[in-house]
Amino acid sequence: MNKILLYCRQGFEKECAAEITAKAAEREIFGFARVKDDSAYVLFECYQQGEAEKLLAELPFSELIFSRQMIVVGELLRDLPPTNRITPVVGMLTGVVEKGGDLRVEVPDTNASKELLKFCRKFTVPLRASLRKDGILLNFESAKRPVVHVFFIASGCCYVGYSLPANNSPLFMGIPRLKFPSDAPSRSTLKLEEAFHVFIPADEWDERLASGMWAVDLGACPGGWTYQLVQRSMMVNAVDNGPMAPSLMDTGQVFHQREDGFKYRPTRNNNYWVVCDMVEKPVRVANLMADWLVNGWCREAIFNLKLPMKKRYEEVAQNLAMIHEKLAQNGINAQIQARQLYHDREEVTVHIRRVWSATPGRRDER
């Protein structure tokens, strides 16, 4: 198996391909990306045998912005016989995976694949039984063992491979299943909820998303992101010239500041969070967020960068590099992560956390 298969958002295949090519080259692993427009996946084929497995192990999945899942696969299985699709799949995995912890039979995230997904659900049960019989899967699910993936791109055609449990998305198809709250002011609320799940470990929520914290939402109207902060029992300064949802104002936790988010200067010195989802050029938002960190106006930030029509990966990379340089020049140590979330559109979401620079692992007390 000498290929890396990456799931991505439909329409962002070129960005996904550019990113994996660059990340592989940084590790002196070379190959070429096979890209089909609007397919919702990318195949990166390594020139040397064994390098796909090496890349899967060495490239942190958390570093990838445009990928929803990363697995190593072999050649495409074509024209699987309708009466016996299982045998070729088992044959592809024999000697490659032993005692896998889970099985996911998946498809690209496109409208055309929805019908195929129904077949995948039915196919999973007999395939799992066969893989367990042959020792490719354990007789029980284990989060500590490799995940077996069967990725159907068409009826009778699939890629077969595996991902590593500590370096993959734990989600089926890499997609979170979040329910839109009926009382939220806008669907954008799901972006911030997903960002919390992606960027903040679940066992740190009570500390880093704690009740009673102060937060600032720049460009808050009508309050989709403010809603998530209120749900975590935070106090929020919502900055926007537009109106906020009355339901949020009635909580007593929201203070509406009718100002331009770029001109607003906080009056409190204990804001833990700043969040921002403004429709603006990405370089302006990136600079603004870097300034908030440099000035010590917050400890963590989550914000969206709206992407141009062309050279989207390059745009994101340049803005992240600028933020990193600006923070470094001011002696600020920070963790920076970015991801095109499932609920994002033509944008990526960035998370920055100040960390204590004097002692590794110590929290930033400013």
UniProtKB/Swiss-Prot annotation:
GO terms, molecular function: S-adenosylmethionine-dependent methyltransferase activity
Gene3D superfamilies: 3.30.2300.20, 3.30.70.2810, Vaccinia Virus protein VP39
Alphabetized InterPro entries for the sequence: RlmM_FDX (IPR040739), RlmM_THUMP-like (IPR048646), RNA_MeTrfase_FtsJ_dom (IPR002877), rRNA_MeTrfase_M (IPR011224), SAM-dependent_MTases_sf (IPR029063)
Residue sites binding S-adenosyl-L-methionine per the record: 188, 221-224, 240, 260, 277
Catalytic activities: cytidine(2498) in 23S rRNA + S-adenosyl-L-methionine = 2'-O-methylcytidine(2498) in 23S rRNA + S-adenosyl-L-homocysteine + H(+)
Record keyword S-adenosyl-L-methionine present: yes
GO biological process terms held by the UniProt record: methylation; rRNA processing
Signal peptide annotation: none
UniProt EC number: 2.1.1.186
Pfam families (alphabetical): FtsJ (PF01728), RlmM_FDX (PF18125), RLMM_N (PF21239)
Compartments it resides in: Cytoplasm
List of catalytic residues: 306
Catalytic EC class: transferase
GO cellular component labels: cytoplasm
Keyword set, alphabetical order: Cytoplasm, Methyltransferase, rRNA processing, S-adenosyl-L-methionine, Transferase
Assigned protein family: Belongs to the class I-like SAM-binding methyltransferase superfamily. RNA methyltransferase RlmE family. RlmM subfamily.
The protein's assembly and partners: Monomer.
Classification via NCBIfam families: PRK11760.1 (NF008734)
Protein purpose: Catalyzes the 2'-O-methylation at nucleotide C2498 in 23S rRNA.
Record protein name field: Ribosomal RNA large subunit methyltransferase M
Organism: Erwinia tasmaniensis (strain DSM 17950 / CFBP 7177 / CIP 109463 / NCPPB 4357 / Et1/99)
Lineage: Bacteria, Pseudomonadati, Pseudomonadota, Gammaproteobacteria, Enterobacterales
The encoding gene: rlmM
